[in-house]
Amino acid sequence: MAEIECRDLVKKYGAKVALNGVNLSLEKQRIIGLAGPNGSGKTTLIKLIERLLTPTSGEILIHGLQPGKETKEIVSYLPDRDFLPDWMKVKELLDFFEAFYSDFDRVKAENLMDKLEIDYNLNIKKMSKGTREKVQLILCMSRKAEVYLLDEPLAGVDPAARDYIIHTILENYNEDGLVLISTHLITDIESILDEVIFLQNGKVLLHRNADDLRAETGRSIDDYFREVFAC
């Protein structure tokens, strides 16, 4: 059974079609890149899987279940925007995640935060943008989830932060699970991908094994991406 199944998935915002007949079957024990230019439908697809949006038509199944309360217990989601409440302290965030998610590993989260010398009594609003982003990532990756949805985790960060993000993902995800990373920066994550999906105008242009795609095209996935989308 596929971990995530999308069947004839359509999402419209009024007259605008964001996703148009998406069919995907994604297996566990894979790191999959969801790539495409801005406006291709990447974030919409991730929000549908997370059930922040509902499809216009079609179906999504996660571990055989429709998105809902049960799937939120097995899906760890990192949005493309800051979700940390300014009024909370770091300790309160840890308390919240520990109470809300049964798969949250507080010891792991604290170890990762200790390496960054983060003060647990610090209010979120007093953190730098970079530190907030790292805290969000730590919270997401400290869950032993079956699915990790990472929406543009590398967007707008410097090279050192990118290295930290990639290292944190690789060292902490549940290897029996599925990692879906949306990005338009293929070059930064190509080396860790098992599969890649290209989205264009809300449609799946390509879904291939990463090694097979490199062998068939004779070039890196990043080079092929730039050719396909004329970057």
Label every PLM stretch briefly:
Residues 50:
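Helix-to-loop junction immediately C-terminal to a conserved catalytic motif
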Residues 58-71:
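Conserved ABC transporter NBD signature motif
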Residues 80-135:
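ABC-family P-loop ATPase nucleotide-binding domains
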Residues 148-152, 157:
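Catalytic Walker B motif of ABC-type/P-loop ATPase nucleotide-binding domains
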Residues 207-208:
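ABC ATPase "signature
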